[in-house]
Amino acid sequence: MKSIIFNEIKKILECDFALENPKDKNLAHFATPLAFSLAKELKKSPMLIASDLASKFQNHDCFESVEAVNGYLNFRISKTFLNELANQALTNPNDFTKGEKKQESFLLEYVSANPTGPLHIGHARGAVFGDTLTRLARHLGYKFNTEYYVNDAGNQIYLLGLSILLSVKESILHENVEYPEQYYKGEYIADLAKEAFEKFGKEFFSQENIPSLADWAKDKMLVLIKQNLEQAKIKIDSYVSERSYYDALNATLESLKEHKGIYEQEGKIWLASSQKGDEKDRVIIREDGRGTYLAADIVYHKDKMSRGYGKCINIWGADHHGYIPRMKAAMEFLGFDSNNLEIILAQMVSLLKDGEPYKMSKRAGNFILMSDVVNEIGSDALRYIFLSKKCDTHLEFDISDLQKEDSSNPVYYINYAHARIHQVFAKAGKKIDDVMKADLQSLNQDGVNLLFEALNLKAVLNDAFEARALQKIPDYLKNLAANFHKFYNENKVVGSANENDLLKLFSLVALSIKTAFSLMGIEAKNKMEH
């Protein structure tokens, strides 16, 4: 709606201007401070300019009123125009708020957890954010592909194999073992050890078979990770292996050398990242010739940046903050625009239950498993709470609040609005088709404001995507639900003289809730279950 109104105003003003959304919808639906920017050029006060501009909008079908207030130009949308937009939305509900196909393309890499164990709650936040960003981008018309980078090489995978070997020796073969400083523990390791022993037999468990054992376990963990994601309604397009980039390392090093991005010192090869804003240079090839994790990651990012996407987006844990300058430096040395590599950081999550820290999983050792939380509160509540705050801010929540059936549980509160609307239609014995001819002229000021809010969803979605601020969607839904409940409690619907107008208004509110929830990966309920 905002873009339509912007274009209507531009036809008359014939210049560029900012269109704002005033908080108080009783004053205006939209406003522009254009008069202030024209004051110097026209040598007039903003109040006079705004008054002159307002006179140009007399008898415009879109607007109920256009007023000059303190130098601002305030617009109120007419009921007739809002009704036209409502008819379009209700006639084609599946297309409501959808964007036209755009040329801009994105590649999102997210989750990319080491395949050494099940996903924990820290992984879940980035996973939910990435999946919602994907749904939103595709809804708005962008080409948006997703990828999971599988770290299937290096020490972490070896440690997985070693941990299983030691578990077999200790728990099954009853040998005395000495655990290294770093190893994987938890019931899932014991389960893998038992399964591996049954599959491979006693003779297999020796030092030389650790790589084979690690590969077998890594594949099992990857299946488990995909199941964890699926449980939260998350599907990633493709999984790419770190190992698949081994052969491209030398060519990447040559390219970096050509562009003076690397140098040799102390028997190692260093990335000259300090030249590009990093705090120091970074080792990418060790003295023994083995590449560091950074080396493999540079090769992978070089490939991603070469695939022709307008922008590559990564979602990383907040502990990777210091990794950003070195990766951007490498991309610049390789001839790419580092602005086309966007990093979104997912901050830490603190989980409580009845005000106390949530218990760690015995299965995972010292982590809270994503699957445990989904099993306890459901994927809808998990997704909502992870989207309720900006991704790069710390999130603390008590899962007990998400099990309550009152307004303190936002998922329940919003769903109650959606279910309430279905209940009202059932009570009236009507369907949406029965109220399509209603012209909405009888709506009072609060009703018009509620209708405007429901129809304003697309502007919220565009803002959320462009700013990567997905919390704008749950914020919008909370306000919409609160305003709906207030309006419902203050106005008689079934049996009233303007029943059809109110039912049509409510159907728009329900459509906005259902659409926004769908983009968040949440099901809008038609009936509340107790």
From Swiss-Prot:
SMART domains to which the protein is assigned, alphabetical: Arg_tRNA_synt_N, DALR_1
Entry GO terms, CC: cytoplasm
Subcellular location: Cytoplasm
Uppermost EC category: ligase
Catalysed reactions listed for this entry: tRNA(Arg) + L-arginine + ATP = L-arginyl-tRNA(Arg) + AMP + diphosphate
Motif 'HIGH' region positions after renumbering to this chain: 113-123
Example GO biological process: arginyl-tRNA aminoacylation
Listed GO MF terms: arginine-tRNA ligase activity; ATP binding
Domain of life: Bacteria
Keyword Cytoplasm: yes
Keyword Isomerase among record annotations: no
Keywords from the named record: Aminoacyl-tRNA synthetase, ATP-binding, Cytoplasm, Ligase, Nucleotide-binding, Protein biosynthesis
Record-linked Pfam families: Arg_tRNA_synt_N, DALR_1, tRNA-synt_1d
E.C. number: 6.1.1.19
HAMAP family in UniProt: Arg_tRNA_synth
Subunit note: Monomer.
Family: Belongs to the class-I aminoacyl-tRNA synthetase family.
PANTHER family on file: ARGININE--TRNA LIGASE, CYTOPLASMIC, ARGINYL-TRNA SYNTHETASE
Protein's UniProt name: Arginine--tRNA ligase
Protein encoded by which gene: argS
